[in-house]
Structures are given as C-alpha cells and as structure tokens.
C-alpha cells in the first residue's frame, strides 16, 4: 500500500464589498475562515452600478468615472484596514455593471486561471425594502452563480 499524497486545494473567496455593515461582516468572516482553513486568498470586489435608466452626457460620464475611482480607493483602504491583522493574501478589483454579473465574472476568471481552487462568492445579506421588492444581489447570485455562494447575515 503506497502513501497517499495529501493535496489541499486553495480556497479563493470572492467578497462583494461596498463598505456597508453587511459587506464588512462578509469580509471579516472570510478573513476568519481563511485564518483557520489555509491555504487561500480573498479577492475583494466593488462593483460600481448605474441603473440602465440613467442617461449621462460624455462630460457627466467622466465626472462619474472619476468619482468611482475615488470610491474604489476609499474602499480598497477600508478593506486593507479590515484585513491588516489577518495575514491573508488578498487583492482588490473594481468593476462596473450589474453587481451579481460582475461577481460571477470574477469567479469564472479565477476558475479559468486556477481550475483546482475552490471558489466561493461571499456577500452580506440585505434587509432593505428595495431588495425585497426587486430582488437582492444574493438572490441573483444564488440563481445564476456557477460556484457556491455564502450569504453572511
């Protein structure tokens, strides 16, 4: 009988992060999970989302994109602060579009680059009335994601 080789697959958590309390809980939960279950890494993703009903002039688009850059820098700094003591490997991406679609795109990209990783999307729950009426990001992810989705309360 030969010795079995242990192969631990890397856990790659895709965390939707907008700085809200729910997103902060999801990020902190991800860091705690990887602290007890290495190896792994976190990709923090902020998605700038304008509804399809918004029509902007080219000048207004430039202003909004500059504002998005500012917000992305602030959110990256907030994520860095939350993860500073965790010693977890992480990176930050900001994207523009539908939040669920972009989180799924990041997960697919990670799977394409690292097919042996275990990829999970982590999001914070939302209890807002608007999300109950039009559907939350978590619900959209649950219906369309090719990878597991964890909703952190």
Region spans (language model):
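Short, hinge-like loop/turn segments at secondary-structure boundaries
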Residues: 60-63, 109-110, 139
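Glycine-rich, Arg-bearing micro-motifs that act as flexible, cationic patches
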Residues: 118-144
């Amino acid at each position: 009988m030969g010795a079995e080789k242990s192969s631990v697959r890397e856990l790659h958590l895709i965390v939707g992060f907008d700085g809200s309390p729910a997103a902060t809980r999801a990020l902190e939960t991800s860091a705690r999970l990887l602290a007890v279950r290495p190896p792994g890494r976190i990709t923090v993703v902020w998605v700038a989302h304008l509804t399809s009903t918004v029509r902007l002039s080219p000048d207004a688009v430039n202003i909004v994109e500059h504002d998005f850059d500012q917000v992305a820098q602030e959110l990256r700094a907030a994520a860095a602060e939350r993860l500073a003591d965790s010693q977890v490997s992480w990176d930050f991406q900001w994207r523009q579009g539908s939040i669920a679609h972009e989180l799924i795109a990041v997960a697919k990209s990670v799977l394409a680059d690292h097919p042996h990783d275990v990829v999970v999307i982590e999001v914070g729950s939302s209890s807002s009335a608007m999300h109950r009426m039009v559907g939350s990001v978590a619900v959209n992810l649950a219906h369309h994601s090719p990878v597991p989705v964890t909703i952190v309360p």
